[in-house]
Every structure is written in C-alpha cells, then in structure tokens.
Amino acid sequence: MFKQTFKVNIIPTQPFEGQKPGTSGLRKKVTEVMKTNYLGNFVQSIFNALPEDKLKGSTIVVGGDGRYYNNDAIQLIFQIAAANGVGKILVGRYGLLSTPAISAIVRARSALGAIILTASHNPGGPNGDFGIKYNMSNGGPAPESITNAIYKHTTSITQIKTTRNVSVDNLGLLKTYEWNDGEFVIEVIDSADDYVSLLKTIFDFDGIRKFVKNHPNFTFNFDAMSGVTGAYGKRIFTDELGIPESCLINCNPSQDFNGGHPDPNLTYAPLLVKKMNNGEFDMGCASDGDGDRNMILGKRFFLNPSDSVAVIASNYKAIPYFNKGGLKGLARSMPTSAALERVATDLKVPFFEVPTGWKFFGNLMDAGTLSICGEESFGTGSDHIREKDGIWAIICWLQILTHHNQSTNDKNFVSIEEIVKQHWAKYGRNYYSRYDYEEIDTAPAEAMMKHVSQQIESKQLIGKKFTGISDSLEYEIASCDDFEYKDPIDSSVSSHQGLRIIFTDGSRIIYRLSGTGSTGATVRVYFDKYETQPTQLNNDVQTHLKSLIHIALVEISKLNHYTGRNEPNVIT
C-alpha cells in the first residue's frame, strides 16, 4: 500500500462544441482529444451528470483498448476522479481492459460505473480515433437520460476539478495506491481474472479442453487484431482450454493496432480470411479493438453474424449456463436478419426486435426477459453481462463443436459448416449481406436518405412490383416505414432508427445513416432474403441477392446518383 496526499485544484475552462456522446460514447480524432482541457471537460461532465451522493466514495472501473493516448487519458481520469470525490478506481493492468471484462467487473464488484476508453473497431494511432464512454452500475452503456445530461454539462462547463498529486507511474504492477488516509484509492487489477471467473460459470471449460485433446487434428486460429483481447487470448485459449499458443496471432496490443483497422470482418482481417479460405484451420475467429465484436469462420466457410446468433440460440442446451437456467427470450437489432426470429418461434420463447445499440438489449436483460441477442455488425452476447462479447461468442462455438463431436474422431468430425447447414435444413436460410459506404460527405448522404424517406412517407412504394434482374422473380413491396421502437420495459420511444422496405415474400431492404466514424458519414444498406427450398440453400450469397441489391441501390435509392459511389468500402 502506497500512501500519499493530494489537494483539489480548480481549473477554469470553456465548452468545446460537438461533445455529444452517441450510442457508443464520444469518438473523435486523437488530435482533437489532445487539445488542452478537451478530454478534461468531458470527464468532468460525466461526474457532473452523476448524483453527488452516489459519486462520493464510489468505485469506478477504468480501462481501455490500448490505443494511442489511452494511458495519458487514464492518468487524467485518476486526477479528476479523486478531486470529484470518487473513493476507489479499479484500473486494468497496463491500462488494458476489454469492454466485456469491464462490464463483468462492474457487476462483480458492485461499482457505480465505468469509464471506458475505446473507439471500438475504429483505427488508432496519433492520427487515428479516440473514444470514451460511461457505463452504468449494471455494466451496460449509459441510457440517453445520462448521455444527454453529460452533453448538457459539456455545453456550459466553466471549471474542472482536478489534482496534480495523483498518478500511477507503472500500471504494469498489480498494486494498491492510497491518498489522504484512504479517502481515494487506485487498485491496479489483473485484466482477466474477474472475466475468466465469470466465463467458467457459463461454459464447460473442462469439456472443451477434453474436446481439444481428443481431436488432435482440430485446428484453431484466433486473431486479436492487435487489440485488447490479445491480453486475454493466451490466458483463455491456451492456459484454460489447452489450445496451442501458436494458434494465436496479433495478440500484442498495439497503440495503432499494428497499422491495421481492428474491425473483424472479411475486409479488415485479410490474413485470417485467406488462411480460412485456403482450408488451413477448422475454426478461425477474430475480435475487434475493445473485444466486444467477433467474426467466426469455418474451413472455407464464412459464418454470417446473423446466422451465428441463431445457431447459438438453437443449440442453447449445449451451453451449461442456458441448459441450467433456460432461455428467457431472444432478441436482435432491426437490421439483423430474421434468422433468430424463426428459432424463437420454434422454441416458443419471447422475441424482440430493437434498434441498433446494445443498451436496448440491456433493458430487456435487466427485466429478466432476454437471454441471447445479437447484431449483424459482428456483435453477439447474452445476459451474463450488459455488453456484446466477442470472446464469449467464440467460446460458444467451441462449446457447440464440443457438443456435436462428443462421439466423433478426426475422420467423422462435425464442422462449423455442417452445423450451420443442419440449421438451414431445419429453419430455412436467410441470405443476408450489408454494404457499407464509408466517409461520404454528409450532405449527399442525407439527400439520398431523404429521397428514400419521401417515397416511404408518401406510401408510393406499397404495392410496387419489381422484376428481378437475375432470377426473374417478382418482388412486390408489402410495407415500408421508418423504424420506431417502444421499449416494453420503460415505454421510452426511439424514432428514426432505419428505413425499412419489406416485400411480400419476407425479403427486406434497410437503409441507415451512421455517424460512428470521426469523419464523414457512413451509409449502410442491408439485404435479407428468406429461402426454404432445399435445392436453394447453398447458393453464393451475392448471386442469390443480386436482384434485391439492384432494386435497393438502383431502383429505389439511386445511391450512385446521390453519392457518386459505385462500390461499397465493405461487404459483409
């Protein structure tokens, strides 16, 4: 125990424009965040938005994904937290904590909340992005009532409470530091301990280890994409599950993610995708910068995130946590394919369709009505925490493989592809794809969305028929709207969550304008087509969706006309 003292200092400041946190907190360029008082203003505004009686003497968890400026920001948070009456900071070793691990720690240690330093899957480095968000005592993202309060304080802030006498020189040491006779404490904790303990209550680690041992030819590859889960990879996959350390790549967290884009998809994880397409591994997986997203691949087989959550749900009995406690309900974000809904119907459990944003799942979980959920954007999770969880999803699939291969050997091994195709044979297949058009100037992006919105508002699309350019099928629009969600728990209403066009055969086209990047806008277009014919379940996705894609991009939105873009940056 290192005992020291500090005094509170008041620093005058002025508001910065644009400090409005979104679904994933505040994300800005590093160069902007490093401006004098910029980050200090936002951190002080977080504390100003919290009830003073709850803040005083409270425990706050702090950590991040290790991107550039992470540890400088942590030292700043220490100083402002101490001056604002926080009693204890739990900080991850080296300043590293995955977002799922933070959620687990908050819940396990009854913390008031957490300050998470991450821009998730956005690039890092001196010219990259930086992010900060506040999570609540349930371990989940702050609701709009809190984020709006934070923003309001950023617009009127005049001073920052801080101190010059609080710092931890070496975050690599697992030690406890004390100031003012215990009035303020910083404890550097192991980044993985609480999280691994939780995972052991969910999965049969011994069973998975036995599966790995009994199938010596089973090959596995995990790509941490130089993000925070590199700090967890060896501990979980090698030490706990018996997978050779040589199967882990890019597991050294890097301030700029080793020059990469830590977004686990087919575009930004090219090395892993190439290896899997070459058939080098039975299972390949990747996680993003802060560890909440996942991509899973089988040998020469891409597992769509929408299918992944559906298969996990349909195999819930293979996972001890759900086999023991049962399924309370299933949910997906609106743009995610309808595959999960068919599982919910079959299992006779409640189903929820919510806007994009994990906080909507959190409300349902806190009310005890939701167990498993997912987003098409490579986010999958359950009620074990209140964030999506990339490592959890990967272990789910290891557990499912273990279940399906209890009596197999290397000759009759049941693969990821076979498990998914068994699922399609039972439930049908949702052919699904998402096109991302990134860093578009805001004005043309908004003009395109307005063009689609006007067609929806006028009802002129309802009953309109299109002939498929590739399949000659007739596509008739049954309904269209701007998705609105009324939360069944707190009755809050979330409007303008995405433009939906639904066809008579159940096919869907969805348009969304996203602002999670630090520059420009991203237009996302989603295509979802349901197929039950046995002879049509194994087609190429882009070929099968060609007609629907043409209708969406050319006939309805005229995307090229408005944005000048001929091709998306990312196809999922």
From Swiss-Prot:
Q: Which is a GO BP term held by this UniProt record?
A: glucose metabolic process
Q: Which SUPFAM superfamilies does the record cross-reference, listed alphabetically?
A: Phosphoglucomutase, C-terminal domain, Phosphoglucomutase, first 3 domains
Give the InterPro entries listed for this entry.
Answer: A-D-PHexomutase_a/b/a-I, A-D-PHexomutase_a/b/a-I/II/III, A-D-PHexomutase_a/b/a-II, A-D-PHexomutase_a/b/a-III, A-D-PHexomutase_C_sf, A-D-PHexomutase_CS, Alpha-D-phosphohexomutase_SF, PGM
Record's keyword terms, sorted: Carbohydrate metabolism, Cytoplasm, Glucose metabolism, Isomerase, Magnesium, Metal-binding, Phosphoprotein
Q: What does the note under cofactor report?
A: Binds 1 Mg(2+) ion per subunit.
Q: Looking at the keywords, is Ribonucleoprotein present?
A: no
The UniProt entry's GO CC annotations, sorted and at most eight, read: cytosol
**Cofactor(s), names only, from the UniProt record:** Mg(2+)
Pfam families cross-referenced by the UniProt entry: PGM1_C_vert_fung, PGM_PMM_I, PGM_PMM_II, PGM_PMM_III
Give the binding site residues for substrate: T23, R27, S120, H121, K133, D292, R293, T356, E375, E376, S377, K388, R524
Q: What is this protein called?
A: Phosphoglucomutase-1
Question: What organism is recorded for this protein?
Answer: Dictyostelium discoideum
Q: What is the lineage of its organism?
A: Eukaryota, Amoebozoa, Evosea, Eumycetozoa, Dictyostelia
What is the gene called?
pgmA
